[in-house]
Amino acid sequence: MILFWTSGLSIYLFLYIFKDKNADLRFIIFGSLFPVIFDSILYFFGLTNQNEYIGHSIFFTVSLFFIFMIATKRGSLFRANSLLFSIGSFFYLVLSFTWLNQSIILYPLFQNSEDIFSLAKNYKTVLGGAGILYLFFKFRNIQILKEFINTGKFIY
């Protein structure tokens, strides 16, 4: 029954929030079913022992969104439909109350434990690496670094 709840309400929320009557709502439905389908396939093939796993993670959904944004051509129908798919996946995570279970919604940051806010041991390394990568790309050369040190602004 939760699948009907998430699919139906995903369509309603999309139309209410975005007011796009021309969107292909099948991609919203498929996106709202994708986390369940993906995790069921992983469970069926024995890749996990949980029926709610990586497909229910916000990082997985955000990663899909970024991949669609980077890999598709702006203004194309494929991109529009891919974004609808991503929106449907986001709606599923909200409407299925996945956000109530931190070990699932924030996988792999949080591990299964009794402590409500027990972070995985390597989160500082991952976050630090992300920060280093960002700064590396922002400070492409010494001139940009000097300008930032002097003014606090980036040269684009």
Model-based region annotation:
Residues 1-156:
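N-terminal membrane-targeting hydrophobic helices
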